[in-house]
Amino acid sequence: MDVDIIDEDENPMLHRTDVRFQLTHEEATPSRLSVRDSLAAKLNKDASEVVVRKLDTKYGMRKTVGHAKVYDSADDAKAVEQDHALERNKIEADEEADEEAAEEA
């Protein structure tokens, strides 16, 4: 799987970089986790700092275009991203937020 960076936009207010990328793959569309790991390796970041938001593969093509958010730290990702996005990318949500939700219930 080859990863090519199409565009990078800095977002200093949220301590992240928005990245658009293109994957070239031989088999079926790769999993979100394998894409996250490949993109993190390409950008020299830890995998917990990368959140893959969208993957789009056209029918019959072996190319996938995607959008990811690369944070300065995993804590920044946990503070900004929605819980379902963190779950999809296998990034553990804050335990404090889980405890607060359990207390309210």
Curated annotation (Swiss-Prot):
Composition-biased stretches (Acidic residues): 93-105
Region annotation Disordered: where it falls in the sequence: 86-105
Family: Belongs to the eukaryotic ribosomal protein eS24 family.
Name under which the protein is recorded: Small ribosomal subunit protein eS24
HAMAP family, sorted: Ribosomal_eS24 (MF_00545)
SUPFAM superfamilies with a match to the protein in the record: Ribosomal proteins S24e, L23 and L15e
UniProt-listed InterPro entries: Nucleotide-bd_a/b_plait_sf, Ribosomal_eS24, Ribosomal_uL23/eL15/eS24_sf
PANTHER family linked to this entry: 40S RIBOSOMAL PROTEIN S24
Cellular component aspect of the GO annotation: ribonucleoprotein complex; ribosome
Molecular function terms from GO: structural constituent of ribosome
Keywords carried by this UniProt record: Ribonucleoprotein, Ribosomal protein
Keyword NADP on entry: no
GO annotation (BP), single: translation
